[in-house]
Amino acid sequence: MTDILIDNTATETVRTLIRAFPLVPVSQPPEQGSYLLAEHDTVSLRLVGEKSSVIVDFASGAAQYRRTKGGGELIAKAVNHTAHPTVWDATAGLGRDSFVLASLGLAVTAFEQHPAVACLLSDGIRRALLNPETQDTAAHINLHFGNAAEQMPALVQTQGKPDIVYLDPMYPERRKSAAVKKEMTYFHRLVGEAQDEAALLHTARQTAKKRVVVKRPRLGEHLAGQAPAYQYTGKSTRFDVYLPYGTDKG
């Protein structure tokens, strides 16, 4: 489990939020590795020996740029957002793609199994709901803490199948800005090994009603070595589309 250092300045709202996740409260940072820091109104991810931190902030940075300047055109085509209103993001991570999908007006159910990452994302969604510029989009995201492959079958029984299951498994990309490389370093050290890709894709194809959309680097291998039905390719990113079992179109 991940350590969390709770500063004296942490608000009661933040303290309540972090109690929802199996984290280990500590009185000082660990000697090495990563940890969460709760201070003021924010939860951040820190790496021992580094000054910078990672937070989920949908109102600034890359998230703000994509929200105000666009940048979701390819993903919109891949999910066919006008025809498929419900999406389950089975690999939510820090929620960037969940937020883009929600900004398209889709109802997004986001799954994140790592407690520290889920805590960061939950905190980011909470703050986005308080910001007039992001609250409408954030309201379209419903976060589930747990393993998507384990939770999706049960959720289908109560909510029915989603139109789309979206996957963005971790993938080592070479051409990254220094800031993104540092953030991914934090993230990889925290999360460790990726999920069983074949099992995840199998469950996704059992779950989706219309299609499974997998985000990959433009020149990256197919997920679990399985060729998609078709794909949408951009300058640096590719979206592979798989059809649910027993269907021939999505």
Curated annotation (Swiss-Prot):
SUPFAM superfamilies: S-adenosyl-L-methionine-dependent methyltransferases
Stated name of the protein: Ribosomal RNA small subunit methyltransferase J
Function per UniProt: Specifically methylates the guanosine in position 1516 of 16S rRNA.
Signal peptide: none
Matching Pfam families: SAM_MT (PF04445)
EC number of the protein: 2.1.1.242
Lineage, top ranks: Bacteria, Pseudomonadati, Pseudomonadota, Betaproteobacteria, Neisseriales
Top EC category: transferase
Any one Gene Ontology molecular-function term assigned to this protein's record: rRNA (guanine-N2-)-methyltransferase activity
Protein localization: Cytoplasm
Keyword Metal-binding: no
Keywords from the UniProt entry: Cytoplasm, Methyltransferase, rRNA processing, S-adenosyl-L-methionine, Transferase
